[in-house]
Amino acid sequence: MAKTKERKALKKGKAAFNLIGRVKVTDKTFNLDNSYDSGWTDNSMYVGVDCGNGNTVYAEMRSGFFPDKDNVIRAYSKDEKDDAGKSKSVEIAWEDRLDESLYDSISDSSFLTVGVEKDVKDKTVYKKFLTAYDAVEYLNEHLEDGMIVNVKGTIGYSEYEGNVSTKKEITSIVLSKIDDEADFKATFSQTILVDSKSIGKKNDDKGTMELVAYVIDYVGKPKIDGEKIEVKKNVTYPKTFEVAINENPEITAKMLQRFFKPKKGKITEITVTGNLVEGGSTVNITEDDIPDDIKELIEMGLYSEEEAEKKIAVGNGNRERRMIIVKPDITYVGTGDDRKPTVAFEDGKYDEDDLYFYEQALLDAGAE
């Protein structure tokens, strides 16, 4: 009897975003002390950042607790290591979460960072929070519409009825030192998997190539038909990206051939960087794009050329949520004098049979 090949464990890589722009605070941005039938109570923030040219990207913060239960916060120790050499996991009682005397022993990666106030010396005041529940409550008091902020966070993926959703969770929101809209941005860095058929069709209108790839994310205990199913594994999600075509198309063609086209049956891992586009276009509007009737308004002095171009940029936008890959990311390997830069790329890291999809993970966990 032939021996069944053991599936190689999937390793989650990078999944991060960075937004710089004007924050958009409305009466729907915050939802405090929202209660559910289960008793769960949470605070949430769903906020947009105008990153220029009508490109408003949304991200969120959310967490809560059960008022009638003993709630704990899981964090990581700053100094203690486990048997694998990783930061040791620690538990903090919910009622101790604001006790700053505990903070010195906790790893910086366990905190959410907020800096949206200035002191009397015009210096940004930074606050650390162990929970989004408290960070959102603070931001509700201090975050103001129109502030120029620098937002960082992680990108998460989930699947429901065959549709893959993307969620951007904020880990840091602080005042930005940038004040020129030309320097606003919405970028991401994401580890993806590609196979021999990932490269899709060219879209001349958008100036991009389709890339049908995969991402890896952790699934804990999803609720299926009202019951929690224990998966606790990294799983694969299909995800379609776009690849920006360079002004010199040969550069893009060479990049795709070198990094995005593994041998048949093999899966390549690569970390890429790119731009997030939501609700607007990142194209630059010039005088040639201004319609004649709007040019008349400029001639009358009712609009400046710059104002008109901004209006047109917004009007030309769409409500798609696009992740447009620009190039491979560069990472560093080694330590000390041996530390060196390298492309974050591993050709043929997995076989096609190693891909472990969400639906299969649910079946293996006992879901019907």
Where are these regions (language model features)?
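OB-fold and OB-like single-stranded nucleic-acid-recognition modules
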Residues: 1-368
